[in-house]
Amino acid sequence: MLVSHRRLAGRRGFPRASGPWALDSGGFTELSLHGRWRTDAATYATAVRRYATEIGNLDWAAPRDWMTEGSVLARTGLSLSTHQRRTVTDYLRLRDLAPDLPFIPVLQGQSLTDYHHCADLYERHGVDLATLPLVGVGSVCRRQHTAEVEAIVRALTARGYRLHTFGAKILGLDRYGDTIISSDSMSWSFSGRFVPGCSPTHRSESNCRGFALSWYRRVTQRLDFSPHTDTTSTSTVPQAERSGPCSTAKHPPGGSPARAGSAPATPPRPGRLSPAKRRPPPKRTPTTGRRHHRDRTQRPWTLRCC
């Protein structure tokens, strides 16, 4: 699960996470609304440390990156190259402030040349992206040209980078999903806005855990992904979620519908997923260590809650 810093900031307390999760900086919303980051690097690092300590199981955290969509550039009044430099500088600053926290570098750009330039900026500052467990690819979630994104992703993969694509489209994952480590999506929440709630407490399904898991299954089946067996559980999907879409108002025992942005805790989590890709899956060893250290064939599809 990918949770936004904007949803967690200011909360007095948090539940403990029952499984690994990742933190999104909420940068697109922050820059779109305010044209700048109102939180400095030190304050953000302090917040991330609190999440890692109090929630636990933090797999990785995005830096205070600067997106490069046209609407964001218009709002900040800065150039694309300035956004790239600030993204790199912020990662370096966070790494110096909190070397023990799992911040990942993020590449920003519009064209393929832009992304190569951003990668070169990291390299010139001594960051060997090819040795890192994960590198984010930003500013792709609103792209309508899937072939263009595919060219960017494949070119970055050719440089030896293990990629997480922020908000990649499902049509895109059909084409280049075999080259990335992970991706995330809020499509389940957007589509759920137009579905009546499954219980009296739900006006719609936009924040419903059962609806999210049902969407998750449909997408992974469409992408021809097969479940990866969770080494800590005998089931990859809670039994109460197997019967179908969230139309019966039945949620897993002990769990309640997850609200967008809530910390990933208490409810049983679905197992991780890896692709079958129309050929027999390779032999796997039990998953150990941090989630993004696993074999590239074991890629999750992450539900974004932000």
Predicted regions and their residues:
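Eukaryote-skewed repeat-based solenoidal scaffolds used as protein-protein interaction platforms
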Residues: 49-183
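Alpha/beta catalytic cores of nucleotide-metabolism and tRNA/nucleoside-modifying enzymes
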Residues: 49, 96, 124, 151-163, ...
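Generic structural signal of hydrophobic/aromatic residues within well-ordered alpha-helices
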Residues: 44, 48, 115-119, 215, ...
